[in-house]
Amino acid sequence: MTTYNWIVIGAGITGACLAYELSQQGLNVLLIEKDKTPNNATVYSYGGLAYWSGTDKLTRTLGGEGIELHRNLSQELDADTEFRDLDLVLTIDRQDDPEVILQNYARFAITPELLSVNDACILEPLLNPNAISGALKLPHGHIHTQKTTEAYLQAFERNNGVIIYDRVIDLLHQGDSVVGVQTENDTYQADNTVVCAGGLSRSLLQQANIEVENYYTHAQLILTPPVDFELGTVVMPAVQQRFILEAKARELTTEDWDPPYDLAPKAILDPGAVQFLDGRICMGQISALAPNPQAKLNPFKAEAEIRERVSNVLPLLEDIPGTCHSCLVAFNNKAIALIGNLADIKGIYIFSGFTSTLVFAPVLAKRFARWVLGKEDKIIEELQLVISATQPHQN
């Protein structure tokens, strides 16, 4: 049986970029993904690159590295990620004071430009002028997240990386070390295993009696077929409820996140939309805090709510065909990401729970791959310290 240097669990954008970067270091890597046809946060991503949103030295450094990486990624991977610079329009509700909202953005690396209603509608003609009191304009990047992930996977395979489609059901232990994984169909051995399973990372690790403070919301959004009109910007609300919802997760106990999942779901809606280069539109999104990762949310109710709220800002989108989808979106309340060795167990790592996933994950994957081979990296070491300080010992 082959013993790999690394097993990476999960082939969304985080697992794909990490597997690629590990293989770039000459390591023998196995990537295991449960779904041959992906159905995850990568597939349903807006694709936005909020490199402007750094608030301290760490996030500003990574924001700069992240946008620079994406500008050159198509060339590096020899495949089109559909990267482009695209203005972000943050709409301000009619009842809100634009100057007050602007002040809320003063802490970011790039200060937004405050637009009048008229100027906002000139920049994005599809906006409803009667629904807003103004807007904030920011430079933003955009990619096709699934095509970017596929580009990473193809480059990974060119580096002799191996991809297997199977479901990981347990970790293989030998003494105080993890030495591989058990899937539904086989076992695989490795010196190191890293979990990049997004919102499912927590439940996967729980099966191995490892507690991790990696949480998730259930996102619901609408994807449309290509349309014959153009949305020229990324449109999102200036006051986003999702971050408030994630902050409320701090009030939950560990028991709330464990079966039998008695906590009633709490949901918010941030109305926004983006159009891809092929003409498809993604609009949403509802975020629901429901500890059961298999929770069943009503797609018909969600679609009606999304259409009502989005059409208030972008009336032309109200009746266009589209299908409501859902996925888990991972987050944590400790750091910009959960990266590093888990508990007191050798050979098991996590790479999940990102803020600004598309900006931070690719550059942190590059840093992590070099760090595990002995290159000093203060950012990865800082993130490891966060995990070490909060991680309970193995049950």
Regions found by a protein language model. Name each.
Residues 20-21, 49, 81-83, 199-324, ...:
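Active-site substrate-recognition segment that forms the wall
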Residues 24-43:
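Glycine-rich FAD pyrophosphate-binding loop
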Residues 61, 90-98, 135-154, 296-302, ...:
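Short beta-strand to alpha-helix junction loop
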Residues 1-12:
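Beta1/beta-strand and adjacent pyrophosphate-binding region of the FAD-binding site
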Residues 136-184, 188:
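Helical element adjacent to the flavin cofactor pocket in flavoenzyme catalytic cores
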